[in-house]
């Protein structure tokens, strides 16, 4: 069995934690006003593309995808506070989903 075909909780959790780490890096880049912030948000967006292992977390990540996309757009438009708000909510939704998953 290929790793991507696994749908057990440890595999799903590992996948979500990887996305969570990209979100951490993107948000820290925003706070420090890194010149590479767009690249970091792009990495977070890229990690959200495609299906999750077994597709079981796709619905939850759809909201996160939308918020990250909006955050990137607001940041490009110079609306730092609104962008940070979107990114923080996306990050928190992801963290709460990981916590819920750990209770399965």
Residue spans for each PLM region:
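Long, charged/polar, soluble alpha-helical segments
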Residues: 1-104
């Amino acid at each position: 069995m290929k790793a991507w075909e696994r749908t057990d909780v440890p595999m799903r959790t590992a996948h979500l934690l990887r996305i969570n780490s990209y979100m951490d890096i993107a948000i820290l880049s925003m706070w420090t006003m890194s010149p590479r912030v767009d690249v970091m948000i792009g990495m977070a967006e890229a990690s959200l593309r495609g299906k999750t292992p077994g597709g079981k977390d796709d619905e939850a990540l759809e909201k996160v995808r939308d918020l990250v996309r909006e955050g990137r757009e607001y940041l490009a438009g110079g609306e730092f506070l609104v962008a940070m708000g979107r990114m923080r909510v996306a990050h928190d939704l992801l963290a709460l989903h990981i916590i819920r998953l750990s209770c399965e």
